[in-house]
Design a protein with these regions (language model features):
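Short cysteine-rich loop/turn motifs with clustered Cys
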Residues: 96-118, 142
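A sequence-composition feature that detects small, non-aromatic residues
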Residues: 48-51, 57, 101, 132, ...
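N-terminal accessory alpha/beta regions
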Residues: 2-90
């Protein structure tokens, strides 16, 4: 696995740009509207969640993060998915492309074989909506690795895959051997 430095930009630097152009969001049934103000009110919760993410990730304890934070009282996971797919991927496309371009030679850091094609939500946006647009939660990867991982539930440390931003496996010794001369 290729180690990548965590993104140089954080949510506070990109959130307003992602929100540009939001006036309302029409739900499927045509009756509920989400206004810009509702997304803007989320920012303090999302920034706190991002800070928690870094703290847990640096201690290799992302499995301890709560699935849904208190932000779910304000806005639901479908709204955060919408924010990612309709705004981050479109008005925030420059940030998406910067994240996608991070691996050396555009090779997937998970498998080291295929070209980076998309971003993986390390903690799924369905179970952890508070991290749907958190740059450190978005890992550049190939299509196959992203879909092989999918949104596996995290119940403990054994459920986590290596995180290219926080797990540098290239610095430790993994193979030990002893030679005896006869």
């Amino acid at each position: 696995m290729e180690y990548l430095k965590p993104p140089e930009f954080k949510l506070s630097e990109i959130y307003d740009k992602i929100l540009m152009g939001i006036t309302k969001k029409k739900e499927d049934d045509g009756t509920v509207y989400r206004l810009f103000d509702e997304y803007h009110k989320l920012l303090p919760c999302l920034l706190e969640a991002e800070s928690d993410y870094y703290s847990f990730a640096e201690d290799n304890k992302l499995y301890l993060i709560e699935e849904r934070s208190r932000m779910s009282q304000v806005i639901d996971s479908d709204d955060m998915k919408w924010l990612y797919t309709q705004k981050f991927l479109k008005t925030g496309r420059g940030f998406y492309d910067k994240l996608r371009a991070r691996p050396k030679n555009s090779i997937c850091p998970y498998c080291g074989k295929r070209d980076v094609y998309e971003l993986d939500h390390y903690l799924s946006k369905s179970d952890y909506p508070q991290y749907a647009v958190t740059p450190a939660n978005l890992i550049p990867c190939c299509h196959r690795c992203n879909h092989k991982k999918l949104s596996k539930k995290v119940h403990g440390i054994s459920d986590l895959v290596l995180n290219p931003y926080f797990d540098d496996i290239n610095t430790g010794q993994w193979l030990f051997c002893t030679f005896e001369v006869q």
